[in-house]
């Protein structure tokens, strides 16, 4: 019955039976069972949470499984560092201590948080999620010669709202600045992990990342306006 509730809200009818069969129940089932619960696939069987990965996944669940989507948004907020960057991935350990994970210079990860939260507000409005307090992670920032670090960070005593977590993520991307062509610096990734060394020295730029950041800023401006944050909305 639980599975029926999760996968039954969406149904399509097209002239293609195979497409109907997949979209009606199986697509949502696969998203929840494989991507969110098992976190495994033919190409990646590590079982870790990916910051960007599972935020993208729950984007498909906001309307149909809001409890699961909300839990993942809060989980990702809790894996953001005080400086605004995030753990690219981490392994759940079932303890009260922060999990081991990798801190990187990948830039697009950060932006999936405000993007997904903006999608949430389109469906559920200002329902209280943005005001939820969540703590940060704390560890030494990456040194100039560090591209990434696998570590167990500390849990920060600082709690801020989901709204502030999203703001910190965008401010972090803004602080990384643009390159000589006026495009966002990609750091060690812009969604395409195979390009992780292109921006490693600090000068690599990304057209895709610039497009995505522009989209996120546009959407977040609308969220800020609805929240009464006029300064952020106008910025």
Residue ranges and their predicted role:
Residues 1-47, 142-156, 163, 221-234:
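Acidic/polar, glycine-enriched structural segments that form the non-catalytic walls/loops
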Residues 8-12, 16-19, 24, 30-37, ...:
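Aromatic-lined, polymer-binding surfaces characteristic
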Residues 37, 68-69, 87, 131, ...:
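Secondary-structure transition/capping residues
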């Amino acid at each position: 019955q639980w599975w029926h509730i999760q996968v039954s809200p969406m149904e399509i009818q097209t002239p293609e039976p195979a497409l109907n069969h997949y979209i009606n129940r199986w697509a949502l089932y696969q998203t929840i069972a494989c991507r969110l619960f098992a976190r495994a696939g033919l190409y990646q069987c590590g079982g870790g949470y990916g910051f960007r990965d599972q935020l993208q996944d729950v984007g498909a669940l906001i309307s149909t499984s809001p409890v699961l989507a909300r839990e993942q948004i809060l989980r990702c907020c809790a894996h953001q560092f005080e400086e605004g960057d995030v753990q690219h991935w981490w392994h759940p350990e079932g303890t009260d201590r922060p999990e081991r994970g990798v801190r990187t210079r990948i830039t697009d990860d950060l932006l999936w948080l405000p993007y997904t939260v903006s999608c949430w507000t389109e469906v559920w409005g200002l329902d209280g999620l943005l005001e939820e307090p969540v703590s940060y992670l704390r560890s030494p920032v990456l040194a100039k010669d560090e591209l990434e670090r696998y570590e167990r960070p500390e849990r920060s005593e600082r709690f801020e709202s989901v709204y502030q977590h999203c703001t910190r993520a965008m401010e972090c991307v803004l602080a990384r600045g643009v390159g000589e062509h006026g495009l966002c610096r990609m750091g060690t990734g812009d969604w395409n992990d195979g390009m992780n060394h292109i921006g490693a020295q600090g000068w690599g730029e990304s057209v895709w990342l610039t497009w995505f950041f522009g989209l996120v800023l546009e959407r977040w401006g609308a969220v800020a306006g609805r929240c009464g944050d006029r300064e952020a909305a106008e910025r």
